[in-house]
């Protein structure tokens, strides 16, 4: 028979990813104890054999057990364990909520030296949000990728920047996923921060090697970021002002506990930097923002749905103006004044916009399904203006040049993932994905104007192919078979 269900946080109602479910099969053994009075009493002792599993990315677990009495122990980091004793006489659905525990007790940690190499995911590291929140970083801004830099096999490159280099690979050779959707150029402030807002993150898993087949493979690593579903018990939130940015987070139930929302926003404040920039006379200006929004709904014990949105963008501006005047003498030795003005403006921006819809369904106690539709638009653009002016009593000469550069990637995809658990030590994952890629590699337009004769030269630089979108189709199927043998 099979027992399945969800493991959640008792306070917030959030599903817990990677929660442990340990099974103790009870076998009754009769023994005889001789009391100090000399009389013999019969006692029943329980001899247990432990096995177990853990919850998936949606907090779901499934265990197939033989008929009889069993004890299920549910545990999660930072939560008090809970034990349920059940009788396996039919298939059961058992949802459990764990309460956070602030009590610190003495503990003995025992581990096997070969535990890592015996795992099918020996290159995987799970990073909970609590670790991200407690990691000291430069300028006080908590960051997901800077926390990963402290993990074995991961390096950070330049000190203080958020790029990760896994086992000798490059910073651009990592697959970055936000709730299953690929992101591009995941950096703010030219690499000082990542686009992942810590308040919106539930859990991060990084695969440094032996990538699971469902990700399709990458050169260096896979970073899978999962966001919060929202507090189903009450409205809660926070407002934070840091050295670089302000952050806002709000979550709670919309109508009842079955529908929740989570909203996080982060933006770089410029009031401090504007004063420093103006005081230093610098022509630079910079800003960025992130917005994460998610609505979750529980249709039934077997069916749940999510709609998620992310938008993040960086803006860089350079503006330089200069003006000078000089006195000259003409051929007739008459003096005249030449006024020269120069203006240079440069605007650079880039960012991702993601929209996704997800539905999960439990077909039976052994088969869990996840269906996702998503789209991501990444855009990068440069707008520059150069203007020169020369004016005197002899006449006026003006030159103006405007240049626009843009490129982008549009991904639209459908994905289906299934988890099938035929037995406690056997998990089969299978599914497929279709992605439609739209590439705009490079479009450059230039306009040059000479004021003297009012001529305008329009130049669409590069070939005609640059103005067209190049499309590509990607389809994949995968099967993962994870079997854990009994340790002798």
Show which residues each predicted segment covers:
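A short, amphipathic beta-strand motif
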Residues: 3-9, 59, 96, 107
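Short, acidic Ser/Thr/Gly-rich low-complexity loop/linker segments typical of extracellular
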Residues: 27-60
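A short, solvent-exposed loop/turn motif at the edges and junctions
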Residues: 28, 70-84, 114
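Periplasmic N-terminal accessory/gating domains of Gram-negative outer-membrane beta-barrel systems
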Residues: 56-58, 78-80, 92, 110-211, ...
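A beta-strand signature from Gram-negative outer-membrane beta-barrel systems
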Residues: 94-96, 150-151, 195-238, 247-251, ...
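Transmembrane beta-strands of outer-membrane beta-barrel pores
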Residues: 227, 243-245, 254-256, 267-271, ...
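Periplasmic-side early beta-strands and strand-to-turn transitions of outer-membrane beta-barrels
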Residues: 232-233, 255-350, 380, 384
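Face-selective signature of the C-terminal outer-membrane beta-barrel domain
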Residues: 296-314, 346-488
């Amino acid at each position: 028979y099979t027992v399945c269900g969800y493991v959640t946080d008792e306070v917030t109602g959030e599903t817990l990813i990677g929660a442990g479910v340990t099974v103790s099969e009870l076998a009754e053994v009769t023994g005889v104890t001789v009391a100090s009075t000399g009389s013999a009493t019969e006692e029943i002792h329980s001899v247990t054999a432990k096995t177990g599993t853990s919850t998936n990315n949606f907090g779901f677990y499934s265990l197939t057990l033989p008929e009889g009495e069993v004890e299920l122990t549910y545990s999660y980091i930072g939560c008090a364990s809970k034990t349920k004793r059940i009788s396996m006489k039919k298939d059961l659905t058992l949802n459990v909520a764990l309460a956070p525990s602030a009590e610190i007790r003495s503990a003995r940690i025992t581990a096997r030296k070969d535990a890592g190499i015996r795992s099918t995911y020996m290159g995987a590291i799970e990073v909970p949000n609590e670790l991200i929140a407690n990691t000291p970083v430069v300028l006080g801004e908590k960051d997901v990728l800077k926390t990963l830099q402290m993990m074995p096999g991961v390096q950070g490159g330049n000190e203080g920047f958020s790029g990760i280099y896994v086992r000798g690979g490059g910073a651009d050779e990592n697959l970055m996923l936000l709730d299953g959707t690929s992101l591009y150029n995941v950096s703010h402030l030219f690499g000082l921060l990542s686009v992942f807002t810590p308040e919106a993150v539930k859990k991060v898993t990084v695969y440094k090697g032996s990538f699971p087949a469902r990700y399709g493979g990458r050169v260096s690593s896979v970073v899978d970021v999962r966001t919060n579903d929202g507090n189903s018990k009450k409205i809660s939130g926070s407002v934070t002002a840091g050295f670089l940015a302000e952050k806002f987070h709000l979550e709670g139930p919309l109508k009842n506990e079955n529908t929740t929302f989570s909203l996080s926003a982060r933006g770089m404040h410029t009031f401090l930097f504007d004063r420093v920039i103006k005081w230093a006379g610098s022509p630079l200006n910079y800003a960025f923002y992130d917005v994460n929004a998610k609505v979750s709904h529980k249709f039934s014990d077997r069916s749940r749905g999510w709609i998620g949105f992310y938008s993040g963008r960086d803006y860089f501006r350079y503006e330089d103006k200069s003006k000078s005047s000089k006195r000259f003498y003409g051929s007739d030795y008459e003096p005249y004044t030449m006024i020269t003005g120069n203006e240079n403006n440069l605007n650079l921006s880039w960012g991702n916009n993601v929209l996704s819809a997800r539905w999960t369904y439990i077909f039976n106690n052994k088969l869990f399904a996840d269906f996702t539709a998503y789209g991501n638009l990444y855009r990068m653009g440069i707008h520059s203006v150069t203007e020169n002016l020369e004016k005197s009593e002899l006449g006026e000469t003006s030159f103006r040049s405007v240049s626009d550069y843009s490129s982008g990637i549009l991904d639209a995809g459908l994905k289906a993932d299934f988890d099938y658990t035929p037995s406690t030590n056997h998990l089969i994952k299978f599914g497929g994905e279709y992605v439609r890629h739209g590439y705009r590699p490079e479009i450059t337009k230039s306009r040059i104007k000479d004021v003297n004769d009012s001529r305008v030269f329009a130049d669409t630089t590069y070939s005609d192919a640059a103005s067209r979108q190049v499309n590509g189709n990607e389809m994949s199927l995968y099967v993962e078979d994870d079997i854990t043998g009994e340790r002798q």
